[in-house]
């Protein structure tokens, strides 16, 4: 009875009249000066700047106040096997004079990035790249330096991606599919680590299962049988105020654009289906003031949507 009631409440929370309406704020195709406008992936916000990453490790820096590009450059980890799937800023800076904290980028792919010096036979893959953002004399970002790579080799995982709390990154979370996107028996596992203290003297940082502080499954935060990201195409992840958000799908009828959410204590859970008003592939999320920023893909260009964060929280159960 408890599960049935909860499921009915969640369904009500997914009603199109209850969900907050997203706003399209940037279309990359509007800016001919941008060299790459497709295949957007991870995203991280620092101040008023959105660092919008693309497959293979390209970065477009966009001013969220004006909606216009600031700069563009390849990441130091750029390579054909760097999907740059999820991104976030940590709290540490490489040097105290740096304008930006270190940027963390999930590789996602299972093949090594040979462009950074790894051999094609190297076992180091699905890495977390740590990038130092390089700026010019005006403080404009124009490149990056790969200052660390973090590796974790769990025994029974199909994929490995990373996220941290957007406002207080004291913990590092590794998450991914146990079996694979939309496959029978799939689950989304999330494992928590203490956020590694950055040291310039330690380029390769290896995490082990002994370092795991906590493990949970996203579907375990929901009633049994409830639809969750384990049933969808997994994209990025975003943690704020104890709530994990996972945008999923491609925006099609077969693979709907769904935003799943669950509070880590299990007290809130559910999803919003945005396919009818946002028929795009959502990729990643970060917070900007009281807005959630979400870069997405259409067939022809990358776009950026904005969600009202407080209204989203209020609409949750």
Feature roles, as predicted:
Residues 46-80, 252-256:
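Beta-propeller domains
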Residues 25-34, 73-85, 130-158, 197-230, ...:
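Surface-exposed loop and turn segments in beta-propeller and other repeat-based domains
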Residues 36-46, 83-102, 153-174, 230-240, ...:
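Structural signature of eukaryotic scaffold interfaces centered on beta-propeller domains
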Residues 268-289:
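Conserved blade-ending motifs and adjacent loop-strand segments that build the rim/top face
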Residues 57-61, 111-132, 171, 180-195, ...:
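Structural motif
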Residues 215-264:
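Loop/turn-rich, solvent-exposed surfaces of beta-rich toroidal or solenoidal domains
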Residues 28-57, 235, 245:
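Beta-strand-rich domains and repeat architectures in extracellular enzymes and scaffolds
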Residues 67-111:
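Blade-loop segments of beta-propeller domains
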């Amino acid at each position: 009875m408890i599960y049935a009631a909860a499921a009915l409440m969640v369904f009500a929370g997914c009603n199109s009249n209850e969900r907050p309406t997203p706003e399209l704020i940037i279309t990359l195709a509007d800016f001919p000066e941008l060299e790459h406008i497709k295949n957007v992936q991870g995203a991280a916000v620092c101040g008023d700047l959105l660092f919008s990453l693309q497959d293979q490790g390209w970065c477009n820096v966009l001013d969220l106040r004006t909606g216009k590009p600031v700069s563009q450059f390849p990441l130091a980890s750029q390579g054909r096997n760097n999907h740059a799937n999820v991104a976030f800023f940590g709290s540490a800076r490489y040097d105290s004079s740096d304008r930006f904290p270190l940027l963390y980028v999930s590789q996602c792919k299972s093949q090594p990035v040979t462009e950074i010096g790894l051999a094609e036979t190297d076992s180091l893959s699905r890495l977390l790249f740590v990038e130092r953002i390089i700026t010019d004399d005006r403080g404009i970002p124009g490149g990056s330096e790969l200052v660390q790579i973090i590796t974790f080799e769990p025994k029974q995982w199909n994929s490995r991606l990373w996220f941290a709390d957007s406002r207080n990154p004291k913990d590092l979370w590794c998450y991914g599919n146990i079996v694979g996107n939309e496959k029978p028996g799939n689950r989304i596992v999330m494992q928590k680590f203490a956020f590694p203290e950055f040291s310039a003297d330690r380029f390769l940082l290896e995490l082990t299962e002994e370092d795991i502080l906590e493990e949970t499954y996203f579907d375990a935060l929901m009633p049994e049988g409830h639809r969750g990201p384990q049933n969808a195409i997994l994209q990025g992840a975003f943690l704020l105020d104890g709530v994990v958000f996972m945008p999923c799908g491609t925006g099609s009828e077969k693979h709907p654009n769904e935003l799943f959410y669950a509070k880590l204590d299990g007290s809130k859970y559910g999803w919003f289906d945005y396919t009818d008003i946002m028929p795009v592939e959502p990729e990643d999320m970060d917070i900007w003031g009281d807005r959630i920023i979400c870069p997405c893909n259409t067939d022809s260009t990358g776009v950026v949507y904005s969600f009202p964060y407080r209204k989203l929280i209020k609409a949750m159960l």
